Amino acid sequence: MEFRGSGATAVEQHLLQSETPGKNGLQATSSDQVGRTLRWFTTVVLNAAFLGMGVSAAVLGPTFPDLARNVNRNISSLSEIFVGRALGYLGGSVVGGVLFDCMNHFLLLGLSHLLTAAGLYLTPFCKTAALLTAMMSITGVSFGVLDTGGNVLILDLWGDKGAPHIQALHFSFALGAFLAPLLAKLAWGTTASAQNHTEPQLDRSALNRSFEAASDSVLAVPDDMNLLWAYASIGTYVLVLSVFLFAPFFKKRSKQKKSAASAQGARRAKYHRALLCLLFLFFFFYVGAEVTYGSYVFSFATTHVGMEESEAAGLNSIFWGTFAACRGLAIFFATLLQPGTMMVLCNIGSLASSFFLVLFDKSPLCLWIASSVYGASMAATFPSGISWIEQYTTLTGKSAAFILVGAALGLMATPALSGILQGHYPDLPVILYMCLGSAVLTTVLFPVMYKVATLPLDRKQEKSINSEGQKILLSSSRLIKEAK
């Protein structure tokens, strides 16, 4: 017997026939319909969850001045909240990766959303920097769990057809990050607190009786009620989503039936760990360059190129705008192109654009064009990398956590190092050198990764993988039999 996709179907049908010989066709059709419905339901909910994560993560930017004022600190002296959130994300990625392999996926993601909602609800009430940092760490942990679990769950649901869905997942995050500043300014008006004292003063006078020692308290109602509504509305959205994530967990057969995609057997590259380490480095350099350029392009344009602040802000917007737009387009390209092809195209685009940025670092026109191309080139790299490695080796929760830790370390280390070096060499375009260096390294790393991934397996390794696939199929068949 051959234990592949068609083999799995044959085993399941044989079991169903032995149980109810007269009804196997109708039951199989009904089961397939329920499975497809649950798969699409889960995919939609995960996209909504990543949208919420994008809004939750990005709302910190436009509300940062209000949060600093809330804890009586200057903006420049409150940078520890970013470190706290990043460390929380690291911890959440590791813990989530371990837990994702040993507990129900939906239960874990639902609990992480409850944690996010709690952190968002409490954030505007924080009156000390230490407590605010703790809240940011809590939301960071939940982000790490969701990022790790969401990617693995999509691959479990869709298998080899998961590339467009991975792209959609990361587009949802980018869309949320794009919408957050607009919602914060237009809908909630969080930065207008200094100009509108009437309503907050009335609220304070009514609430001061309950918070007489507000200056010494750890938690208190914020002076700016717009800040409260901003975080409360996002927290409510996340809380509602947690209900939809818990729903499949409580569904009778959700724990018993695995998707057909995940029942096709485990894949494992010959040098599985080496491949994960290479992808760890790849994401370290890629994410570091992406965040570094997005964080410093405004200051680089004003100090090095001599742009006006309004022009520099537009340049920053064009980078993130093309980034978000091309993540959306990548959903459709992923249905036509292999993940490896998309990664090659992204590497070529980022290498060419960063090279021209370094070559013509004083040219505003080149800066506009190359920034657009650079943003577009970086957009599909991360989700394509996740889809690509799944073609050669099965991505478990621990594996996903490992490579996401590489991305998180790059996010923290590269911008910090770039800022330090730029301070030491103010006349050099250090930021552009870092981006070019990262582009060169990722372009070199990918062929090495491809070579390692495609090395043929030994006979002993093939037997081990076939045995593992057989166990998965027999386990899946037993569960279907029990469910019936």
From Swiss-Prot:
Q: Which InterPro entries match?
A: MFS_trans_sf (IPR036259)
Q: Would the keyword Electron transport be found if you checked this record's keyword annotation?
A: no
The UniProt entry lists the main location of this chain as membrane
Residue positions, PTM Phosphoserine? S6
Q: Where do the TM regions start and end?
A: 40-60, 80-100, 106-126, 135-155, 168-188, 227-247, 274-294, 317-337, 340-360, 366-386, 401-421, 428-448
Q: In which tissues is it expressed?
A: Expressed in brain, liver, lung, and kidney. In kidney expressed in cortex and inner medulla, in ascending thin limbs (ATLs) and lower descending thin limbs (DTLs). Primarily expressed in the proximal tubules of the kidney.
Q: Which UniProt keywords apply?
A: Cell membrane, Ion transport, Membrane, Phosphoprotein, Sodium, Sodium transport, Sugar transport, Symport, Transmembrane, Transmembrane helix, Transport
Q: How does it sit in the membrane?
A: Multi-pass membrane protein
Keyword tRNA-binding applies: no
Location(s), subcellular: Apical cell membrane
Q: Name one GO cellular component term.
A: apical plasma membrane
GO MF annotations in UniProt: symporter activity
Q: Which Gene3D superfamilies is this protein grouped with?
A: MFS general substrate transporter like domains
Q: CDD domains, from UniProt?
A: MFS_NaGLT1_MFSD4B
* GO BP annotations listed: D-glucose import across plasma membrane; sodium ion transport
Query: What is expression of this protein induced or repressed by?
Result: After water restriction, up-regulated in inner medulla ascending thin limbs (ATLs) and lower descending thin limbs.
Q: Tell me, what does this protein do in biology?
A: May function as a sodium-dependent glucose transporter. Potential channels for urea in the inner medulla of kidney.
Q: Which family does it belong to?
A: Belongs to the major facilitator superfamily.
Task: Return the protein name.
Answer: Sodium-dependent glucose transporter 1
Query: What species is this protein from?
Result: Rattus norvegicus
